[in-house]
Amino acid sequence: MGNWKLLPNRSWVDSLILMKKKTKTSATSLKPPAFLLDLLNARSPSGYEEEARDVVRSNVEKYADSFVVDNLGNCHASLGKTGSPTLMLAGHIDELGLIIKHISDKGFLYFDAIGGHDRSMISGRRVDILTSKGTVRGVTGKRAIHLMSIEERKRVPEFHQMWIDIGASNREEALERVMIGDAAVYDHGFEILNDSLVVSRAFDDKSGAYAVNEALLRLSKGSKPSCKVVAVSTVQEEIGTRGAISSAHLADPDVALVVDVSHATDHPDADHRKYGRFCLGGGPILTRGPNIHPGVFERLIQCAKKEKISVQIEADPRPTGTDARAIQVARNGVPTGLIGIPLRYMHTPSEVIDLGDLEAVVRLMVTFARSLKKGEKF
């Protein structure tokens, strides 16, 4: 079992941890992959994923045996034209966004949310508005705290109490630049915090989309797996796992692995009794629960042991809030596993991950794919 150790009074599967000091990837060997940076730079709120889709195509199509964009906009990159089993790897390329709902007489843009925002984090952010004429810069605003009563200061503003300022003098001037239904994203780019810890908007789930496609690229260059592999960059996950519903029908997998971010709880104000203990740099988070096929989970554990990859185990008693919930029940059911990338500050403009965890996720998927035997069923 290498450096695996057991925590006292727990079953091995609940406490399987690889000693971090012996397995953590050297920070000096970790460089942000250009593919990942391109995905993060792409603006792709749910339903408006064109920029991210173009990035996936330009990085993956030349390595795939086939590359298909379905009617909803999911990208399907396949390795192996036929094969049993078919392994689906899924990560979503959409991100949180804002959508313009109203333009006032004074030229201010009122908006609603695409996806689940923390309203307390919205005001004072620079945003890019995606229009048919190009990008329009703006800043989110609300009434200054100095102009609020004591009671008003205690309340989080509703969406209709905030706006985007693009510097327009009136409605007509604003309409020359934007229109109702245009989407916007925060302008918060990639930065290195310390060693392998990095911050950006939209690691949820550009990091997962990078991981599934990078796994396919590595499988294309090394020894080919016995199975067919389909890396799917799904869309509209943030508004109800919609892309996963349609893509699972086209991919028609025998087994699936979904990669999404998962809450790291190694920060203040996280109750481990309620949320569990998960840390950046601790390795991929593997979920157990009704949404997860036990055989797929066990195979992931075996692959992690083989590659000496540290893993963290999460229990979820409900359908997870990921594409796994949709893929598991597609067609006549799909044995599904869920791999989490530990992340701090989810659904904010500044999400933090460890690049070492991301690399471990890619390695784990590559090993899983190569472990599948021809005709194998779960």
Which residue ranges define each predicted feature?
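N-terminal hydrophobic/helix-forming segments and targeting peptides
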Residues: 2-4, 8-378
